[in-house]
Regions:
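Carboxylate-rich, polar loop motifs that coordinate divalent cations or form catalytic acidic clusters
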Residues: 1-499
Length: 499
């Protein structure tokens, strides 16, 4: 099942990487080193440390692309070239003086694309190509709006003319594309190609004259669209964060400020070698670890407080925090949007959920409750830790702040029916070793063994175990049944022994 959740995230701001607040694009070399086009130069990140490299005659770097031999091509204001490792260090080689005819200005480089070893530089109005030995300007069929690498081919969008494909050193018009709005991504799908426009309208290659989906209201303005390795699509917007779509173009997840990412503005997205996402924001960079099997469930999805307990019961997930109980239905697929709902009446510290057969109980600082579908039924007023099943289906044992008590079900209602005498200790953890031997472990006083008869009455004096009987100390001793055997854990060891 998939629940509404937040990926683990690392945020990097200008203080971390010592550059400008805005970042524009990413790429990664064969060794996993990340490169970032930043307002103050080229950033390099090895997973631990950031480095910044200035580009001569330019402050901003808008485009970055790793080419052959791990050369890192960059484009800035009236500057193009590449960085590479030499005996002198990570050095920059400019290509601007090699451009024929030598222009006085090429303005800013907005995008860099690599196809079959050739490097294409997309300026504000023209296209340059470097083949490894020379750089030249290509004759564009018009005013250049955007460029894309699609199915290992170069595609241009020309203002008021549509899309053109670069074939055999020439540009060939793609019919039916004249009326397309500004495109930010052309991505492969299962049976066709998907065109994402800046205004949020999505087209398919087999019906370019008719919008397939209008996401203009949800998305607003789109800045970036990429296909992920699992077949999903990641969409970065100007004012509404990051969306993940499945191959059917249905929204799976939505991350925005205070809900998964650190900003509403996403300038670009990059999936790295580990299938995680680097997100360029209006202020800094987020690293979303979406490939991990772990995620966060916190205030951003409606769960307030520190987590203490979790339980899956009757197709619902119950989360217990120091602020109460939060619940959500389990889904085969995540519906968007989806958040946890606070369980009314559960305000305060939750310690545990105890399931006995087909009933779920809440162990709470305020006492013990039975959890019904949409309500709580209180039946004990002393702060409660845990319940344990007995041989009698109508009797349960409960550990609370003042000892161990029995509860009996009468006419469908649970009522206190007795208690273990001579035990006034807070009974945090209960575990049956067998039908007649119950262990209780205390947070800082050690372990207690109780021998009970069939009526849950003491047959022997309660035995106390702690440091004096072989435990490393009396602190944080717990008991568990592991593979059918009783084991104890302490603050230092796991102990497999019988006393």
């Amino acid at each position: 099942f998939i629940l509404n959740k937040i990926p683990l995230k690392s945020h990097f701001n200008s203080e971390h990487y010592k550059g400008g607040i805005q970042n524009w694009s990413f790429d990664q070399d064969a060794n996993g080193i990340l490169y970032v086009a930043n307002n103050k130069g080229l950033l390099e990140f090895d997973g631990n440390e950031w480095n910044k490299y200035k580009v001569p005659l330019s402050t901003k770097v808008r485009g970055v692309k790793v080419g052959r031999e791990n050369r890192v091509f960059v484009g800035g204001q009236n500057q193009i070239g590449y960085f590479e490792n030499t005996k002198k260090g990570f050095e920059f080689t400019s290509l601007i003086d090699n451009l024929e005819p030598n222009p006085k200005s090429i303005a800013e480089i907005w995008k860099i694309i690599e196809i079959n070893g050739s490097i294409f530089f997309n300026t504000e109005s023209k296209l340059l190509v470097y083949n490894g030995s020379e750089i030249r300007e290509l004759n564009s069929p018009g005013f250049l709006q955007a460029s894309f690498k699609h199915r290992n081919k170069l595609i241009l969008q020309i203002y008021e003319k549509g899309l053109f494909e670069f074939v055999d050193s020439d540009f060939q018009h793609i019919s039916g594309t004249q009326l397309l709005p500004e495109i930010v991504g052309i991505l492969e799908n299962v049976n066709d190609d998907i065109y994402f426009s800046r205004n949020g309208i999505v087209f398919k290659s087999n019906q370019l004259n008719t919008p397939f989906i209008d996401y203009s209201i949800k998305f607003g303005s789109i800045n970036s669209a990429i296909k992920l390795s699992n077949g999903d699509f990641a969409i970065g917007t100007q004012n509404n964060g990051l969306f993940i779509l499945n191959p059917n173009l249905t929204i799976k997840k939505h991350f925005t400020k205070n809900n998964g990412i650190s900003d509403r503005t996403v300038k670009s997205i990059y999936e790295d070698n580990f299938n995680n996402l680097w997100v360029a924001l209006n202020n800094g960079i987020d690293y979303l670890k979406i490939s991990l099997p772990f995620s966060l469930i916190n205030e951003e999805v409606g769960v307030e407080g520190s987590g203490y307990a979790v339980h899956n019961f009757k197709n619902k997930i119950y989360l217990g925090t120091n602020n109460g109980v939060f619940t959500q239905n389990l889904y085969s697929e995540l519906t968007y949007p989806s958040k946890y709902i606070f369980f009314k009446g559960s305000e305060g510290q939750v310690w545990n959920f105890s399931q006995i057969d087909d009933e779920l109980f809440l162990n709470h600082n305020k006492g013990a409750f039975k959890i019904n579908d949409n309500s709580l039924e209180k039946f004990h007023d002393i702060g409660s830790w845990k319940f344990k099943k007995t041989n009698d289906p109508n009797i349960i044992l409960g550990g609370d702040y003042q000892g161990i008590r029995s509860f009996k079900k009468i006419n469908g209602k649970w009522n206190r029916s007795g208690e273990i005498p001579n035990l006034n200790e807070s009974s945090r953890i209960l575990e049956f070793e067998n039908d007649s031997t119950l262990w209780m472990t205390h947070g800082y006083k050690g372990a207690y063994r109780l021998h009970l008869d069939s009526n849950l009455q003491l047959k022997k004096t309660i035995q106390h175990f702690g440091k004096h009987s072989g435990f490393p100390s009396n602190i944080l001793i717990s008991s568990y049944i592991l593979n059918g055997k009783l084991v104890f854990t302490s603050e230092k060891f796991c102990i497999d022994r019988y006393f």
